[in-house]
Amino acid sequence: METFDFIHKKFGFGMMRLPMNGDVVDTDQVSKMVDYFIDNGFNYFDTAHGYINGLSEKAVKTCLSSRHDRSEYILTDKLTGSFFKKQEDIRPLFESQLEATGVDYFDFYLMHAQNAHEFVKFKECKAYETAFELKKEGKVKHVGISFHDRAEVLDQILTEYPEIEIVQIQFNYLDYNDLSVQSKLVYEVCEKHDKPVLVMEPVKGGNLVKLPTDAQPILDALNGDGSNASYAIRFAASFKNMRVVLSGMSTFEQMQDNVSFMKDFKPFTKEEYKAVEEVAEVFRSHKMIPCTSCHYCVEENHCPRNIRIPEMFANYNTKKTFGDWNADYYYNNVLVSGEHSKASECVKCGMCEKVCPQHLPIRELLVQVKEEFEK
């Protein structure tokens, strides 16, 4: 496939966590990152209509498509269920995405955040059929899905729609054997259906960058000076069916680090596989909340109490893992302020749980947060 062959390296720029100046994207910084990425031989970019409340697609136009020839890069966008109610809504949404990103076609167009519930809606609205029509018209080169559910659901989707060409999955060494995320089992379904794989969350929302103090020595003992991010990203990239591993880089320094070890990619060694499994065991012993900070739970008014759910979970993990004394102050004086409610003020509506890609029991977890910080 022409587009697949044009993917220069196994590393992509996920434009979900871009550097910000307040409420706006720092386009100067992003442009610098884009240029550095392309100058070092990389060419895969990923966005979605809802990322940063629509600012990600606009940043693609400002920082990428208006500054680089279309032949220099591969661009993936996604069809998200929350932005359409019926089939007739899909084409206008798609055209608005082309306009927002400043291109006249997408290399990959993914049915976004597919799970058992979303798949029903996408079928009812003939979203897959519409995407396949867009491909015939040349507005999309390849149709795929991004997926967050159990392996048997993916098997069902790929069986019903064998035309799907690529699958984006959450895959990292912490989730590899996780019973809820099922990274290993989901990957094996992709192999069964002979579908190449795109990787999201290789560092699990940053959780595999800042390790628990009792886990860090495990990676430090390895021969070499690799960063924590390097071990996480290289782990995912070492599986043979992985075409691109995405990283949601938010600083130029992160970009430099990631490029440094992915420019001349070296697969994982047996020693490294053993080390990251030991790190995963340490994480599991801390019983951390496995939130990736995607913010779906708080976007589009999904939380009527405006609780800062991802930040509270991250703060909880920080205190539990590192014993950070500052976590209590941060909870009471930063996370709970103005219009933002305490964890105890959750009204148990469950809207957050319906959109959580990790299928977390958010209402129960907020009780844990309350018990930790509202003593």
Task: Name the predicted role of every residue range.
Residues 1-73, 130, 136:
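N-terminal binding-site loop/beta-alpha segment at the start of enzyme catalytic domains
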Residues 44-51, 141-145, 168, 244-246:
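Short catalytic-loop micro-motif centered on adjacent basic/acidic residues
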Residues 51, 67-88, 112:
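Structural motif corresponding to the early beta-alpha repeats
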Residues 27, 35-38, 42-43, 62, ...:
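Structured C-terminal cap/extension of enzyme domains
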Residues 56-60, 150-155, 255:
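Short, well-ordered alpha-helical microsegments
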Residues 14, 48, 109-112, 146, ...:
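Conserved residues at the C-terminal ends of beta-strands
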Residues 46-47, 77, 199:
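Hydrophobic residues in well-ordered beta-strands that form the structural core
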Residues 21-22, 35, 84-203, 210-217, ...:
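Glycine/proline-rich, positively charged
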